[in-house]
């Protein structure tokens, strides 16, 4: 009585599919996957030495400044 058989799980799955629909479940799974991916990326970035992170931000700032200057000249 305490354990669930395969039929119990199939009924639960069918009810979940009826309530939420496959579109919501698919988009929810995609969102969860991208959140896990971003979390892992953040954990990897945390392991980098601070000097490397500073160099990357300087490069990004320089490219933004160049892009801003280009946009100003285009006007």
UniProtKB/Swiss-Prot annotation:
Subunit structure: The Tat system comprises two distinct complexes: a TatABC complex, containing multiple copies of TatA, TatB and TatC subunits, and a separate TatA complex, containing only TatA subunits. Substrates initially bind to the TatABC complex, which probably triggers association of the separate TatA complex to form the active translocon.
Keywords on record: Cell inner membrane, Cell membrane, Membrane, Protein transport, Translocation, Transmembrane, Transmembrane helix, Transport
Purpose of the protein: Part of the twin-arginine translocation (Tat) system that transports large folded proteins containing a characteristic twin-arginine motif in their signal peptide across membranes. TatA could form the protein-conducting channel of the Tat system.
Compartments where found: Cell inner membrane
GO terms, biological process: protein transport by the Tat complex
Single GO MF descriptor: protein transmembrane transporter activity
Family matches, as Pfam families: TatA_B_E
Domain of life the protein comes from: Bacteria
InterPro entries linked to this entry: TatA/B/E, TatA/E
Membrane topology term: Single-pass membrane protein
UniProt name for this protein: Sec-independent protein translocase protein TatA
Gene: tatA
A cellular component annotation (GO) from this entry: TAT protein transport complex
PANTHER family xrefs: SEC-INDEPENDENT PROTEIN TRANSLOCASE PROTEIN TATA
Ranges for region Disordered: 41-75
Family: Belongs to the TatA/E family.
Membrane-crossing segments per the record: 1-21
């Amino acid at each position: 009585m305490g354990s669930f058989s395969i039929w119990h799980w199939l009924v639960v799955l069918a009810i979940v599919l009826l309530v939420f629909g496959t579109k919501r479940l698919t988009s929810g799974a995609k969102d969860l996957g991208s959140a896990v991916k971003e979390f892992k990326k953040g954990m990897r970035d945390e392991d980098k030495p601070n000097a490397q992170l500073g160099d990357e931000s300087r490069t990004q700032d320089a490219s933004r400044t160049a892009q801003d200057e280009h946009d100003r000249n285009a006007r």
